Amino acid sequence: MKDIVKAMLLRGTNVLLARRSSRPRNYPDRWSFPGGHVETGEALDDALVRELQEEIGLTPLVFWKIGEIIEPNPSINGDVLYHMYAVNAWAGGKPSIVGDEHSEIRWFSIHAACALQHLALAEYVPILRKLL
């Protein structure tokens, strides 16, 4: 099973989501969270730091694991375990898109994020609700 880390950046009662670009075969144009694959031998926390630097130009400073999701559609993305993290302090200023994995990033209230029609995974909602 592949491991993927995902970060729910928090700013007050808002959470940062990233719209995946139209390029990937898995969940194109869907709202998700910054993150990515854990490399062989890499600790989850180290992967989270690396992925946030690569995708949105930030270094997480205060974060904790808030849950896990097993990929609900293995035919789309393979056997994946998502490690979900909450992040409430970071260095590097404002998040910005780095690279071409995302077409947009935006802050949403947690309630609005739960109601989005185009979330990559419906399983994000129960984890988002833990943040309320």
Each language-model region and where it sits:
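Conserved N-terminal beta-strand and adjoining loop/helix that marks the start
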Residues: 1-16, 37
